[in-house]
């Protein structure tokens, strides 16, 4: 349960920083704070990070943009997925859903809680579990993410 997690994981309440980030044109990649990954990894024991940069990889096995994690098999993996949050996120959510359904993967998605999007209604609502932290995620640089996060869990079809 993530309800008790916010105090332990240093939630963000910096409204000025949130507004500054929301109005910037920076890229849509957000590195997962290590505390959040560690907390989820205790429960899921991840084996694959399919969408990362070499310097942000959270698992021994990982795919970078050059490897194209969308084109790789995730069969029987325990996947931690923090995809780019731009227009491609729907493709990543489809991949997570399909790999759990068809290839025995357990996929935990660390994604914006964008309940008004097509990808949310097409894939996220089909997840085995959806968790919502109470507060926004705080970055290691002291800033915070400009949107609420959800942890979406697709379990393998048995």
Outline where the language-model segments fall.
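Class I S-adenosyl-L-methionine-dependent methyltransferase catalytic core
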Residues: 2-158
């Amino acid at each position: 349960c993530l309800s008790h997690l916010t105090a332990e994981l240093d939630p963000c309440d910096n409204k000025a920083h949130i507004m500054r980030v929301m109005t910037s044109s920076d890229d849509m990649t957000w590195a997962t704070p290590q505390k959040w990954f560690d907390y989820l990894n205790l429960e899921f024991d991840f084996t694959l990070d399919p969408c990362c940069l070499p310097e942000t990889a959270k698992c021994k096995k990982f795919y970078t943009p050059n490897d194209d994690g969308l084109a790789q098999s995730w069969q029987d993996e325990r996947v931690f997925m923090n995809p780019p949050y731009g227009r491609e996120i729907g493709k990543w959510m489809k991949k997570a859903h399909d790999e759990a359904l068809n290839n025995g993967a357990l996929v935990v998605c660390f994604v914006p809680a964008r309940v008004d999007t097509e990808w949310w209604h097409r894939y996220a609502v089909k997840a085995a579990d959806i968790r919502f932290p109470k507060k926004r995620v705080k970055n290691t640089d002291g800033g915070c993410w400009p949107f609420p996060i959800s942890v979406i869990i697709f379990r393998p079809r048995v």
